[in-house]
């Protein structure tokens, strides 16, 4: 009998501190940097974002989202046999955020736990990885988390990037099933574009070598993102032999409303079939897709049997898509 993986529970967590464009603009004005709500909304669709407090870590956010996903799944947390955290902003160089989540969940079953880094494509990469683990037969209940504290790597002297990103976490529980849940996944990367979206620094000899802040060539990212997202979405659909007209919900990486609308248009999907949270969350990198997925599940938009297409693109350059039957 063929073994599949299905999402049986979703969860998410946003730090309580919500910062509107007006509040951020006022903060930047004190530094002599000019921006406005209109400027930010016009270019990105973002109206607010959430920031973690200084003593809150990536694994803290991840664990809270994980608890909610496990509760929604209706399983005992001791049944989790794989934890995978997609993040670019872990607590430490090591140990992994996944091991810290395991500790914070109180899991003593010695389940496998590791991090995966594909920036804003991270959750799709993580979902595809966990799907393969389950299909191979060695694992039954996988916890896949996207979690970020991007506010820690923003240069608040650069108005073109600091207004775009926020913090948060989203999680799903994948379970082995006889019924198809994840219908297809497609992953790609092109390292020749590594320099258009990056944090070009590292720790060497106890000091930071290079820059510890995010750098982005916005125009280059926009041009590449719209093109590769359309291609990888069609690839995932073709692998599952599903037409774009059969998609009930499109959940793209929540980076920029113009990129998202461009992708939906290329697939021939009306805007009302796209889940949008970028206005309230900003770009939360690997957390953006599971945050949006959880929102649409909990408010009842996503129903059992719906076809849901997830797609992400991020630094590396990486991109990927996953087609689900919920």
From Swiss-Prot:
Enzyme Commission number(s) of this protein: 2.3.1.180
Keyword entries, A-Z: Acyltransferase, Cytoplasm, Fatty acid biosynthesis, Fatty acid metabolism, Lipid biosynthesis, Lipid metabolism, Multifunctional enzyme, Transferase
Reaction catalyzed: malonyl-[ACP] + acetyl-CoA + H(+) = 3-oxobutanoyl-[ACP] + CO2 + CoA
Active-site residue numbers: 120, 253, 283
Molecular functions per Gene Ontology: 3-oxoacyl-[acyl-carrier-protein] synthase activity; beta-ketoacyl-acyl-carrier-protein synthase III activity
Primary enzyme class: transferase
Region (ACP-binding): 254-258
GO cellular component: a single term: cytoplasm
InterPro entries in alphabetical order: ACP_syn_III_C, ACP_syn_III_N, FabH, Thiolase-like
Main location group: cytoplasm
Domain description: The last Arg residue of the ACP-binding site is essential for the weak association between ACP/AcpP and FabH.
Role played: Catalyzes the condensation reaction of fatty acid synthesis by the addition to an acyl acceptor of two carbons from malonyl-ACP. Catalyzes the first condensation reaction which initiates fatty acid synthesis and may therefore play a role in governing the total rate of fatty acid production. Possesses both acetoacetyl-ACP synthase and acetyl transacylase activities. Its substrate specificity determines the biosynthesis of branched-chain and/or straight-chain of fatty acids.
Protein name per UniProt: Beta-ketoacyl-[acyl-carrier-protein] synthase III
Taxonomic source organism: Ralstonia nicotianae (strain ATCC BAA-1114 / GMI1000) (Ralstonia solanacearum)
């Amino acid at each position: 009998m063929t073994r599949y993986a299905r999402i049986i529970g979703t969860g998410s967590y946003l730090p309580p501190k919500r910062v509107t464009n007006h509040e951020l603009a006022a903060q930047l004005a004190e530094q002599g940097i000019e921006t406005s709500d209109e400027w930010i909304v016009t270019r990105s669709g973002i109206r607010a974002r959430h920031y973690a407090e200084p003593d809150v870590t990536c694994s803290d956010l991840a664990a809270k989202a994980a608890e909610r996903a496990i509760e929604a799944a209706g399983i005992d947390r001791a049944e989790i046999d794989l934890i995978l955290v997609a993040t670019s902003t872990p607590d430490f160089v090591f140990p992994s955020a996944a091991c810290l989540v395991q500790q914070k969940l109180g899991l003593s079953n010695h389940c496998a736990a590791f991090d995966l880094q594909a920036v804003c494509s991270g959750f799709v990469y993580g979902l595809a990885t966990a799907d393969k683990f389950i299909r191979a037969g060695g694992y039954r209940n996988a916890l896949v988390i996207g979690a970020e504290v991007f506010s820690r790597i923003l240069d608040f002297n650069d108005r073109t990037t600091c207004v775009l990103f926020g913090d948060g976490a989203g999680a799903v529980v994948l379970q082995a099933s006889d019924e198809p849940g994840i219908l297809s996944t497609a992953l790609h990367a092109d390292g020749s574009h590594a320099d258009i979206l990056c944090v070009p620094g590292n720790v060497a000899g106890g000091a930071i070598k290079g820059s510890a802040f995010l750098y982005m060539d916005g125009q280059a990212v926009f041009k590449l993102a719209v093109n590769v997202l359309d291609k990888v979405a069609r690839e995932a659909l073709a692998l599952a032999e599903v037409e774009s007209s059969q998609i009930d919900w499109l959940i793209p990486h929540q980076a920029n409303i113009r990129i998202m609308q461009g992708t939906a248009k290329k697939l021939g999907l009306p805007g009302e079939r796209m889940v949008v949270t970028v206005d309230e969350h900003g770009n939360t990198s690997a957390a953006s897709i599971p945050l949006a997925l959880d929102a649409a599940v909990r408010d009842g938009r996503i129903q059992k049997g719906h076809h849901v297409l997830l797609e992400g693109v991020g630094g590396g350059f990486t991109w990927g898509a996953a087609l689900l039957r919920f």
